[in-house]
């Protein structure tokens, strides 16, 4: 079955077809960097990383753009509270984001445009909307007129134009607009706020216009995929449809709208007021990054996911089994090569059928591989894919430890198992660690003096780096104390961290 993707706008799975054969233009709304990234961000960007990985594994060239909203009310408020420039707040939290995503094995997008870099393009787009009478100038800025294109209302959420509560359509102030459903395109700055010159006076962009301007700059008038969290469908993404389609006259703006589900904590929506709000840094102090990734991928990206300590502990056990299977196969290949087993046959191939046992088990793995690909082609179903991969991870050690196959066939199967796991658990799901780490999980005696300590220390240091980048000094100190208790001396230098055993 060819790839089918669920489109929020049409509310159905459709065969995936792009404007240009073999290429995908994908825009995903990025963070507003006023505070450290949290588990909701982890869910979102791991989901779109999965989509990115599968498209590339399927032969597509993906042109991936993800923005940073580096000017916003919350950033300004945080900067005022700290008495620093708003760009310092944004940059600090952008660094935190990159560090967290790297730890979670999220591949980088091709471009990360920032709002402050595209203000001229935003002003040009607002001017066009005014000229086409889709926007109007008021005493406090420029507003988009919903009444100028009522047919576009509710395209993603299905709600009626008359059903919107007052004030739902914009983050910035709402005085001066003609209709409560109108939203801000350009907001005149108050004294002391960041400001850019414009034909309507010094000010800054509204929330929604930025993404329309950035997608137009990078992809043109129409593109293939627009993604983001479920909460962005309204007002943000519906506002983008208004702005972009009214500006360019082209419809639809996007071929496929893709939205990921929410993250709940122990059955409740994650929120600071409920005290169940986790930053990624806080989560990685307690759980390995790939364990967290494993847990988040064990749900379809459109489904809500209820994170709990029980779920994360279960993911820890499942991920350990996966890594151990990978390590086991790697160890067998390495030991076979050292023992002089040469010309290890490349599976699958016809002459292996002389071993009925191996042929039957090989058939099971090939079937799982096919089923995993079918699941990914069914709207990127990572839950089903992960289930197939874990079935393989249970099967691989059983075959490698079997007495029914000889040394050469065992080596051949181990090599096939490594490639099998690397294809889906690694390239597609992004769940495999470095080879030496996996081998040590299976056989710690590979480096009895320092291997286990070295891996644990490096994992702790990586978590400490994340905490330090987010200025989470308490977590960083806790990790340093844990290292000290292990007899590890940590020294921070301009060239990086140096550690030694006391």
Task: Name the predicted role of every residue range.
Residues 68-73, 94-97, 107-122, 140-148:
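Short, glycine/charge-rich beta-strand/loop segments that flank catalytic centers
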Residues 60, 134, 488:
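Short phosphate-binding/catalytic loops that engage adenosine nucleotides
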Residues 80-86, 110-116, 229-230:
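The substrate-binding groove and active-site-proximal loops of carbohydrate-active enzymes
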Residues 1-34, 49, 63, 120-332:
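Alpha-helical recognition segments enriched in aromatics with Gly/Pro capping
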Residues 269, 279-502:
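Structural preference for alpha-helix termini/caps and helix-kink/transition segments
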Residues 10-15, 19-107, 492-499:
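N-terminal, positively charged nucleic-acid-binding surface of large information/translation enzymes
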């Amino acid at each position: 079955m060819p790839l089918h993707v669920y489109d929020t706008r049409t509310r159905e799975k459709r065969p995936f077809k792009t404007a240009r054969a073999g290429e995908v233009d994908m825009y995903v709304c990025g963070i507003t960097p006023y505070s450290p990234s949290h588990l909701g961000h982890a869910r979102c960007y791991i989901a779109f990383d999965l989509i990115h990985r599968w498209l590339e594994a399927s032969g597509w060239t993906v042109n991936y753009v993800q923005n940073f909203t580096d000017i916003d009310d919350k950033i300004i408020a945080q900067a005022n509270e700290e008495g620093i420039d708003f760009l310092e707040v944004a940059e600090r939290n952008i660094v935190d984001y990159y560090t967290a995503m790297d730890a979670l094995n999220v591949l980088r997008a091709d471009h990360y445009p920032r709002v402050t870099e595209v203000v001229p393009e935003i002003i040009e787009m607002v001017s066009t909307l005014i000229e086409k009478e889709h926007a109007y100038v008021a005493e406090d800025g420029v507003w988009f007129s919903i009444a100028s294109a009522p047919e576009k209302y509710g395209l993603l959420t299905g709600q009626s134009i008359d059903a919107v509560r007052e004030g739902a359509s914009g983050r910035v102030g709402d005085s001066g607009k003609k209709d409560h459903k109108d939203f801000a395109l350009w907001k005149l700055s108050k004294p002391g706020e960041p400001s850019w010159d414009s034909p309507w006076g010094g000010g800054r962009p509204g929330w929604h216009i930025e993404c329309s301007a950035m997608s137009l700059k990078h992809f043109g008038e129409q593109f293939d995929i627009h993604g983001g969290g479920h909460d962005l469908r309204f007002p943000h993404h519906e506002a983008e449809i208004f702005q972009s389609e009214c500006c360019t006259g082209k419809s639809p703006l996007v071929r496929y709208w893709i939205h990921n589900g929410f993250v709940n904590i122990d059955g409740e929506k994650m929120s600071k007021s409920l005290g169940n709000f986790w930053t990624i840094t806080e989560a990685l102090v307690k759980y390995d990054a790939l364990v967290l990734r494993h847990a988040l991928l064990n749900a379809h990206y459109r489904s809500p996911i209820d994170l709990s300590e029980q779920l994360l502990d279960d993911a820890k056990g499942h991920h350990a089994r996966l890594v151990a299977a990978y390590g086991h196969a790697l160890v067998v290949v390495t030991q076979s090569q050292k023992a002089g087993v040469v010309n290890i046959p490349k599976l699958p191939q016809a002459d292996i059928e002389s071993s009925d046992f191996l042929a039957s088990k090989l058939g099971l793995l090939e079937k799982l591989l096919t089923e995993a690909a079918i699941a990914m082609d069914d709207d990127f179903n990572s839950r089903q894919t992960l289930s197939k991969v874990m079935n393989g991870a249970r099967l691989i050690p059983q075959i490698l430890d079997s007495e029914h196959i000889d040394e050469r066939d065992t080596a051949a199967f181990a090599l096939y198992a490594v490639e099998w796991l690397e294809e889906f658990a690694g390239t597609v799901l992004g769940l495999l660690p470095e080879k030496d780490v996996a081998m040590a999980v299976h056989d710690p005696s590979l480096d009895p003096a320092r291997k286990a300590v070295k891996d644990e220390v490096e994992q702790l240091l990586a978590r400490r780096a994340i905490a330090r980048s987010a200025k989470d000094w308490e977590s960083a100190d806790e990790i340093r104390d844990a290292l000290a208790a292990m007899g590890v001396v940590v020294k921070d230098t301009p060239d990086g961290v140096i550690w030694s055993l006391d």
